[in-house]
Every structure is written in C-alpha cells, then in structure tokens.
Design a protein with these regions (language model features):
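Flexible, low-complexity linker/loop segments at domain and module junctions
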Residues: 1-10, 265-269, 345-383
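Conserved active-site "lid/cap" helical segment
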Residues: 2-3, 19, 24-100, 255, ...
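Condensing-enzyme catalytic core mediating Claisen C-C bond formation in acyl metabolism
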Residues: 5-17, 23-40, 193, 197-263, ...
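Conserved small-residue
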Residues: 12, 30, 89, 132, ...
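Active-site pocket-shaping loop/turn-to-helix segments
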Residues: 53-72, 115-125, 142-154, 198-215, ...
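Active-site-proximal gating segment of KS-fold condensing enzymes and close homologs
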Residues: 93-143, 283-296
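Active-site-adjacent elements of ketosynthase-type condensing enzymes
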Residues: 100, 178-200, 235-254, 278-290, ...
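Active-site-proximal alpha-helical scaffold in enzymes
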Residues: 125-129, 133-136, 141-175, 210-225, ...
Length: 383
C-alpha cells in the first residue's frame, strides 16, 4: 500500500467546456440541470499574433480557457513568486494538435505539407505543452501525459511527485482536448457513439457523446488554508484489453484503494464520487459493480458527462473542477439524462441534484485501454 502524502493546495482552477467559459458558467449549468451538448464552434477565438506558429484548434481552446477566472494572472503570479524554473507545467491531452496534422494530410502536395502547415511545434503530442510554456514563460519541468481519458487526472499525480521530490515548488496543470477526425471516426468505428445525449449508468445507455474542454489548476505545497486540497491519488493499468475494461474492475479497484490510502481515508469517509460514467454498456457496468463493492449506500455518486460530453484527455481535470465546485457550493450534481439506474449503483447514484455538504470527494477517470486514475480532494478550512 502507498504511504500517506502531504496535501497540496489547489490555489486556483478553471474550466471551459460546452457549459460555458469559466467556473460561473459551469456552476450555473450544473445547478440548472442544463446540458451543454450541442453543435458548437469556438474557433473564432484567435491566438495573439505573437503565438501564430502554435495556431490550431486545440491551442485556441487552451488560450480561451486559461483566460477565465483570472487563472492566467494567478499562474503568472506563482511564476513571479517561486521563479520560472521552480514552477512545473504538466499537461494532459489525448490528441493534442492532431487536427492540424489531419489537415496537413488532406492538403499534401505530393509528399510535402503546404507551407502554412510546416510547423513542427504542431505535429507533436507536446504541442499543447510547448504553446503553454511559451505563453506563460515557465522554465521548469514541462511534461505531457497522454493516457487517453485519464490524461488530465494523472497530471495531478505527476505534480504531487514533482513537488514532493523537490523538482518544483508549484505546478500549473492543464488538460485540453478538441474534436478531430481521428477521434470521431475511431469511436464511430467501435460503435460507441450515441445518436442522442449520453445517459450514464442508465439501463438503456447506448454510448458516449464527444465533447471538448480546457481545464487548468495551480497546485502548491503551501497556500491559503481555505483552498481545497489534493489529498490522494491512485493510478493503475488493467493490462487487459485495448478498449474494454477488466471485467472484474481490477485496475479501477486498485486506483480507488491507492487514492484512499494516500489520503489516509476509509471508504465511508467519502461524501461524493464523480464517476467516470461514459455511458458505454461495459464501462458503466464495471464501474457500477466496483462502486457497490467498495462503498456503502451513504456515499453519494453521480456522472456528469451528460452535461459536457466525454472530453477525452480533458475529462480528468474538467471533472476535478466539477468536483471542487460541488464541494465549494455544497451540492451533488445530477446524473443528467439518466432515469433508470444500473441496479448495482442505484443506491448511491444521484439521478437528480442533491443539496448536501461535501468535505471529502473522489473523481474517477478510467481511460480507454485500462489506464485508470482516482483523485481524492478535501475541502479547505471554512471561510
């Protein structure tokens, strides 16, 4: 079993998704039980001319998202406080700027890219990190995590290790993913995309809705006592199948157990769990069985992809932001669009929004290919 970790302050966080720009829009939609799933195009949001070489759909969404809730100012203040070489930048993305690479393939002239797409900073999994490093001016460690749907949950774990080992004093975390043909065609080929808004844990669920999001967080060893804390995390791999979770949920169980151990918590200490809940038949079946085995009926749980869609590599940090907002405002978000809950999870699943205090919460990200991460959060000292 892993040993308990020292909590990290989450000094700032923000998220932009189909629900809107920033925490206010996110909280308003969650409280109004309003889905954001609709056709959308944010590409009118430009990058500043100085960053023209990084211009692509993914980096535009990153720039749009980082401007919300004063996060850009908070990140720059941390860099000023600690020094540019003592602030790590850890990013999670499933596809990065692959949309620009797809555009390049479509525009090939013989075997050459058109001049406007001959930009090596785009055609790499590290495009997001390179762009944010340039935009923020960080000179500390810069790491990209690309583990499918758990990518931007795992960045919290990476940051904790960097800070604990003395590699950095603080970390700026980013998770961004946007639509691209590779994802749309891939999930359609697997027959995993629903023709309607997804219904997590509903007995009639029939697949995912794909979304886009950008989320950011600033974590530090010290911070305002009122700030929420990252108190634990667990990571695992199913080592089972490229697209199907282990039928007994072995990886999910290990991630949950390790998160609780690092936080020094028992299952009944948890008030709320934001479930991965993709609305695919097998994923939800396995997660429901694990939840029923590990947690009692007093623990409340919900899945929020009915609000935002499955934002892939950005899902971890987006759903961490939702969890932190739920803790801050004292409510359990609804499991939107779902009506008839999977029997195994019916006792814990909040179909409708519930008002209740939340002091300790978990957020699950159980990714494609069996890459799993559970994050544990605790509320800060009351104001």
């Amino acid at each position: 079993m892993p040993t308990r970790i020292a909590p990290l302050a989450i000094s700032a966080f923000t998220a932009t998704s189909a629900l809107g720009h920033g925490r206010g829009a996110l909280a308003d939609a969650l409280r109004a039980d309003r889905s954001g799933l609709a056709d959308n195009d944010f590409t009118r949001v430009p990058l500043p001319e100085v960053f023209a070489e990084y211009d692509c759909r993914n980096n535009r969404l990153a720039w749009h998202g980082i401007a919300a809730d004063g996060f850009l100012d908070a990140a720059r203040a941390a860099i000023e406080r600690y020094g540019a070489d003592r602030v790590a930048l850890v990013v999670g993305t499933s596809t990065s700027a692959i949309g620009a690479t797809e555009e390049g393939y479509r525009a090939l002239d013989g075997d050459r890219l058109p001049a406007r797409l001959r930009r090596p900073v785009l055609h790499t999994p590290h495009s997001l990190g390179l762009f944010l490093e340039a935009a923020l001016g960080t000179r500390g460690p810069c790491l990209t995590v690309a583990t499918a749907c758990s990518s931007s949950a795992k960045i919290f774990a990476k940051a904790e290790r960097m800070i604990r080992l003395g590699t950095a004093d603080a970390a700026i975390l980013a998770g961004v993913d946007t639509l691209c043909d590779s994802v749309l065609f891939g999930f359609n080929a697997l027959e995993l995309v629903s023709s309607q808004r997804c219904r997590p844990f509903d007995t009639a669920r029939d697949g995912i809705s794909i979304g886009e999001a950008a989320g950011f967080a600033l974590v530090e060893r010290d911070g305002d006592a009122r700030a929420p804390r990252l108190v634990g995390y667990g990571e695992s791999s199913d080592a089972y199948h490229m697209s199907t979770p282990h039928p007994e949920g072995r990886g999910a169980r290990l991630a949950l157990a390790d998160a609780l151990a690092r936080a020094g918590l028992e299952p009944d200490d948890v008030d709320y769990i934001n479930l991965h809940g993709t609305a695919t038949p097998k994923n939800d079946e396995v997660e429901a069985a694990v939840l029923a085995d590990v947690f009692s009926a007093r623990v409340r749980a919900s899945a929020t992809k009915g609000f935002t869609g499955h934002t892939l590599g950005a899902a971890g940090i987006l759903e961490a932001a939702i969890t932190l907002l739920a803790m801050e405002q004292g409510f359990v978000p609804a499991t939107l669009n779902s009506r008839d809950a999977e029997p195994a999870v019916a006792a814990q699943l909040a179909i409708e929004r519930e008002e209740r205090p939340i002091r300790v919460a978990l957020s699950n990200s159980f990714g494609f290919g069996g890459s799993n991460c559970t994050l544990a959060f605790a509320a800060g000292t009351p104001h």
